[in-house]
C-alpha cells in the first residue's frame, strides 16, 4: 500500500503503518542469508584475519580479536577465495608446507599472493569462528573442468586417492565436506581474467556441474549471473546460462553495490542513495523472472534460487579503490577498497538487509562483501586494534533477531518521496520476522532526509504483548564515521520513544530522519 507523495517541511512528522499477520508467510529465514565473503584482496586475509606476530594472534596466526568480532557479527556462510581473485587462482598453491608455497602475481588486484593462507587455513579459521560454512569458488577463468574436479576430490573425498591422500598428508585427515560451490565469478565482466561469452561460460559451467555431481551428488552449485543489473549483458546472460545449466545447479548469483553518486555541482545524490533497496528489489524480481521463464521453457520441475553473494555499499572507482600499477609494483596486501562507512551508509546497508529478508522466498543465500578491511564491517590496523564500522550494527542485530525465524508478508502503508534515479519511492521500508519462540522482530528504515516518522506496528490477532524494545542507528551528522581514532562514534542506541498498547495490539515508535531501527516484541 502507498499513500500520496508530499513535500515535508523540516521537523514535520510523517506517519506509516505496518500490519503483522501470522497467517501470511513469505518464507523461513535461511541462515545463509547472513553470509559474508573473504577474498584474497588488499588486507582482507593478510593483516586482516591472518597476522602472525600480532599481540592477538593465536598459534595459527589468526587474530583472536577479529575472530571475536566475526562471532559477534553473526556471519554464517563464508564465500572464499574470490571474487575476481579466483579467476587466476591455482588452489594447489595454497596447500602443503608453507615454505614450499609459491609467490604468484594476482592479476585481479595487481598484487603479490604469498599463498601463506589457503584452503586448510580457511577451514581451520572457520572452526574457530564458530563452525561457519565454507562456500568455495572454483576458477573458471584461467582454468576449467579438470582443476575444479581435482579441488572437489581433494576437499571432499575421505581418502584412498592421490588427491584425498594429499589432503590427509597436509593435516586434514577428515574431508572438508564443502557443500556450496561457486562456478567461477562474474564471468561476463570484461575486467575478469578469462572473461567469457554467455555461450562459452554456460557450456563450461554445465560440464563442470555435471562432473562435480558425479564425484559428490550432494554439492550445491551457484552459477554466475550477470555481474550487475546495469550490465549490457544482463538478462540475456541469465537466459543463456540457465538454459544450459538449469537442472544441474541450485543457485544463480546476483551482485550489487551502491553509493551516493557525485553530481555536477559536487554534491551527492543522497535521496536516490537512500532508496537503494528499491533497486535491489527490482534486481531480485528481474532475476527471479529469468529463472521462472527458463523453468517454464524447459518444462523443468527443478527449483533454482538466488545467491546474492556480493552486496554492500561501495564507493566504487573512488580513491580507496585504485589498484597499484606498474610492471615492478606488485605489493603484498596493499590497502585497497578500505571504505570508511558513514551513518547514512549504515542506514542504506540496513535497508538492503530488509530487502533481502523480504525476498527470502527467492533469495536463499547472500554474502556481504566483504568481511574484514575490504569494504567491510570490521577494520583492523597491523599490530593494532580491530573495530566495528557503522555497517556492523544493522548486520549483527538483524542476524541475531532474524535467524531461525519466518518472514511475514509485509503489509505497509507509507508515504513517498521523489528521487532522480528511481522516481517516486516509499519513504519507509520494513519487514517483520516471527521468531521460533513466537516473538516478533520488525526492521524498518526511514529514508526521509527531512521528516521523522510515527511508525505504528499492528501485531497479530491474539498476540500476548508483554515487552517491547527498539534500537536505532541515527546521527544528525549523516557523515559521522567510526575510525581508528574514534571507534565508537556511531553505535546503536535504545529508542526511548517506543510505546505499546496491549488492548489494541499496537506498538508505536518514532523513527528519526535517515535512520534504521529494529523493534523486538514479546
From Swiss-Prot:
The active site is at 186 (proton donor/acceptor), 310 (nucleophile). The record marks 314, 370 as: Important for substrate recognition. Keywords: Carbohydrate metabolism, Glycosidase, Hydrolase. Its EC number is 3.2.1.55. InterPro entries: Alpha-L-AF_C (IPR010720), Glyco_hydro_b (IPR013780), Glycoside_hydrolase_SF (IPR017853). Optimum pH is 4.7. Completely inhibited by Cu(2+) and partially inhibited by Co(2+) and Ba(2+). It comes from the Bacteria. Alpha-L-arabinofuranose binds at residues 39, 84, 185, 257, 310, 370. SUPFAM superfamilies: (Trans)glycosidases, Glycosyl hydrolase domain. Optimum temperature is 57 degrees Celsius. The keyword Translocase does not apply. It catalyses: Hydrolysis of terminal non-reducing alpha-L-arabinofuranoside residues in alpha-L-arabinosides; (20S)-ginsenoside Rc + H2O = L-arabinofuranose + (20S)-ginsenoside Rd. GO terms for molecular function: alpha-L-arabinofuranosidase activity. Catalyzes the hydrolysis of p-nitrophenyl-alpha-L-arabinofuranoside (pNP-alphaL-Af) and the hydrolysis of the terminal alpha-L-arabinofuranoside at the C20 position of ginsenoside Rc to produce ginsenoside Rd. Cannot hydrolyze p-nitrophenyl-alpha-L-arabinopyranoside (pNP-alphaL-Ap) and ginsenoside Rb2. Belongs to the glycosyl hydrolase 51 family. Homohexamer; trimer of dimers. This is Exo-alpha-(1->6)-L-arabinofuranosidase. It comes from Bifidobacterium longum. The lineage of its organism: Bacteria, Bacillati, Actinomycetota, Actinomycetes, Bifidobacteriales.
